[in-house]
């Protein structure tokens, strides 16, 4: 049987590879402490689970859901956005619930790109931006994110011949993997750049509620002109510890939202209705979980930054996101450091090159590690230094 070229050319997904390595080590009876994947270890709040249990018992929720989501859910999403960011959205035309924001990111490439078009993708970045664009038949132009520019793309460095074919601009702040943040000035610049070059902006903002030291991330849609050129993907996964329930949203430009809705309606049958009702409970209920999460992650951030500095790594504490972006010690590449750390200590980190060539020289560490495991990992890092 011959597979399609798009599948044959598809690289292995980074986090699947990491999970396999972890499983192999554990199968040998070796202890593994993984800082590799940003999957919250904290539980979904009880009042949200209670709504799920109640909804699951109602036979009305056992049938096919509406692809575009319950009207009451879209209303809750719009109200949450206005309350959190001051952004007004029409729940009927500017809000689309998703089976996790990753679904919408994957679909967006098919909605806004044709074969031969160019997608402008940050480097380093969440791999799905580039992979989904390539699956849609587009070429990818990588925009380097460098420390010298605060891990923001330099739009002026994009060649004119690339811009003439570019159709989509991917951006993501607070950023994965760098932990960098962006303000309204940058988002306004992005919106103006997109308007000038007729680009569709897709901003991925799932980490807006994970922030530290009093910092409050902003939404791309708060910037003047943003809704005219783009959409924002958001997720309940990180904010409410709901990665396993798979629910997110796309909001913003009505034409782009309609395109996603049309594409989605032909590929899936929507989000299970009980999970939609669960999401309403999350958005409309107590938001205490968000501040509680941030307190836990900030404590872990501080412990891990201290531990990394103690082994000679010049680490900047992130203002937001679930990640620490750490430069590797002199004499190592990203991959060689990650490999040696795993082999000698059982500590798993993600090499920066897994997110793009501009990630060379860095590793990413996640804060979603239970406190006991975190302390074991810190002890192993100290032991690694003593062996070096």
UniProtKB/Swiss-Prot annotation:
Residues with PTM N6-(pyridoxal phosphate)lysine: 238
Superkingdom as given in the UniProt entry: Bacteria
Listed cofactors: pyridoxal 5'-phosphate
GO biological process: lysine biosynthetic process via diaminopimelate, diaminopimelate-aminotransferase pathway
Binding site for substrate: 13, 38, 102, 126, 176, 364
Subunit organization: Homodimer.
Protein name, per record: LL-diaminopimelate aminotransferase
């Amino acid at each position: 049987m011959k597979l399609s070229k798009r599948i044959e050319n598809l690289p292995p997904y980074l986090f699947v590879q990491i999970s396999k390595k972890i499983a192999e080590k554990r199968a040998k009876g070796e202890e593994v402490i993984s800082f590799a994947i940003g999957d919250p270890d904290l539980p979904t709040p009880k009042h949200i689970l209670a709504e799920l249990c109640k909804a699951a018992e109602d036979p009305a929720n056992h049938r096919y859901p509406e692809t575009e989501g319950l009207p009451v859910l879209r209303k809750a999403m719009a109200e949450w956005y206005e309350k959190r960011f001051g952004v007004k959205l029409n729940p009927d035309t500017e809000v689309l619930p998703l089976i996790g924001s990753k679904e919408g990111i994957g679909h967006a490439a098919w909605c806004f790109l044709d074969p031969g078009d160019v997608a402008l993708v940050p480097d380093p970045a969440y791999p799905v931006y580039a992979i989904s664009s390539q699956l849609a038949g587009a070429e990818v132009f990588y925009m380097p994110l460098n420390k010298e520019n605060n891990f923001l793309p330099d739009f002026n460095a994009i060649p004119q011949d690339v811009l003439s074919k570019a159709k989509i601009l991917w951006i993501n702040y607070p950023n994965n993997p760098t932990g960098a943040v962006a303000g309204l000035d940058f988002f306004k610049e992005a919106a103006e750049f997109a308007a000038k070059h007729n680009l569709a902006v897709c901003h991925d903002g799932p980490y807006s509620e994970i922030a530290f030291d009093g910092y409050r991330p902003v939404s791309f849609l708060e910037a003047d002109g943003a809704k005219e050129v783009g959409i924002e993907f958001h997720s309940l996964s990180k904010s409410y510890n709901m990665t396993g329930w798979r629910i997110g949203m796309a909001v913003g430009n009505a034409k782009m939202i309609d395109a996603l809705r049309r594409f989605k309606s032909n590929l899936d049958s929507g989000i299970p209705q009980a999970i939609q009702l669960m999401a309403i409970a999350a958005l409309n209920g107590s938001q205490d979980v968000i501040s509680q999460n941030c307190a836990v992650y900030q404590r872990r951030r501080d412990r891990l930054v201290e531990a990394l500095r103690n082994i000679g790594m010049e680490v900047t504490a992130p203002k937001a996101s679930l990640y620490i972006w750490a430069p590797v010690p002199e004499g190592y590449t990203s991959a060689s450091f990650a490999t040696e750390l795993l082999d000698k200590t059982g500590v798993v980190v993600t090499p920066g090159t897994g997110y793009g060539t501009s990630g060379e020289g860095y590793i990413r560490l996640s804060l979603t590690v239970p406190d006991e495991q975190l302390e074991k990992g810190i002890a192993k890092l100290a032991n690694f230094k003593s062996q070096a």
